[in-house]
Structure formats: C-alpha cells, structure tokens
C-alpha cells in the first residue's frame, strides 16, 4: 500500500478547496500562493497525485509502461508510482522532521545564505530567490552565465527553453542581456544548482527508501542520463546528486527515445512535460500526451 494516510498526503485543502470562505478569484490566488510557500505539502501532494493517476492508467485502462523517467521531482514520483518503493508514510515522517525544506533549501534558504556568505541582515525585506522560464537556447544562457554570480541554469526543458534561478536582480540582468521572452514561475525552493550541494547527505537521507519491487521497466535517472539499478542506496544517491546540479530534460528525453520509446504519457500537472517532449522530438515519430490540463475538469475533458 502506498499510504495509510493518502488523504493527508494529497493535501486536499490546497488541491480541492471547498471552504465557504473561498468566494473570489483573489481568495483562490491567495490560497494558491500559500500552497507555493509550503514546499512539503507540494512535494507530498505532487507525488501522491502521480501515484493515483498511474494507478488509474494501469488498473482502469490497462496501460503498462516499458520505460519511466521524470522531470525533477518526477523521478521520485515514478519510483512510488510504479511500486519500486512501498509506502510513502516513512518518507513523509523523515521529510517533515528534516530541516531540508523548512530552512535549508526553502524558508530562509540557509544553504544559499551560507554559499553566498550573506550577513544575517541581508535580504530581510526582499526576495532572496526567484525562478524564471526563458525562451532561449541553453548554450547561449550557459555562456552568458560564465561571467555572472548568484544566478544558475537549473533546468533545460527543450533546445529553445530553459529555467534559471537565483537572486532576482541577477536573474533580471541576465534576461536583459539575452533580450529573450521570460516568465517568473512560482517555485519557492532551491534545487539543481551548486548551493544545494552542501545538503547532499540530508537529501540522500530523506530519499532513502526500501526497494520492495523491481518491475520489468527501464527506469532512467537524471543523475547519469541512463537506466539505473533499483537499489536503495543508488536511487537515493541519484536524487541527491541531481538536486545539486543542472537537470537536462532534453538529454533525458533523447536517451529514452533512443532506447525505443515512442509513446509518452505525462502523469504530471498541466501537461508541460508532454509539450516539452514533443518540442524535443520535433518531426520524429512519437506520440506525447498529458493527462492533466489546468482548470479543466477531468469529467468534462473530451479527450477521455
């Protein structure tokens, strides 16, 4: 069983607000921001939603995967969703007791403060860290970053789209230099960059789970961009390593495609990964589908 407290892990108070006090779009936005500012509930609900969606695909539609890979936290989701790891309850207990998302890579972001050698009085009244999606080629962004500090290339989505993160002013200066389309994204933790490397042991501890099954599925990891062994120590190390460096989703998609995959089903929110997969593969033979569209009722979705 995935969990004895699935309702708690889903955090329905954020995903499915039913309170009579939510009367306006503005109040809904405030609740959404509260969710963004709660990394542990976001982590747990994201994984739990993927687990449930995967069970529906397998049990209701009879769809079984030959390969699996994830985008950032999606690598954790795939291991629970396909039964490599068992119950999430022990991990939830470790996660919520850990300083990792409370103060190290979220909240006051002390790992960043230490890495940048900030004073206690620095960034008390302004944002320390922001994320931005850029419509720009990864190579151009990486080149521009060579002479900059406090801003990092954290994710490569496609050959034309990346994600940067860091001190807001440094990010905006980079965007101004590149003269590219950009969008701020509501992420409130620090991952996939050097300031996180000091947290390797704690990240590994949080993600150390007993392997309870080894399905006949090729599991790909962003740690080495190849298939991984289903070993508790190796899986935790994979995740702890890629938390501290850029994740190249484009490279991961290419590796999975070269392994023979042609049909891709995105189990995450907004079908973003489905879009990125298609952008990466272009005119090559493939089908990329997402199960979730923002603000679209599943019952009313005419694709089902």
Residue ranges and their predicted role:
Residues 3, 180-181, 283-288:
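Structural alpha-beta junctions
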Residues 1-30:
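Active-site machinery of serine-nucleophile hydrolases
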Residues 274-291:
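Short acidic, glycine/proline-enriched helix-loop-strand junctions
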Residues 187-188, 291-294:
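Short, acidic/turn-prone active-site loops that include or flank metal/cofactor-
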Residues 25-267, 272-273:
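Acyltransferase
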Residues 295-302:
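Conserved small/polar residues in nucleotide/adenosyl-binding loops
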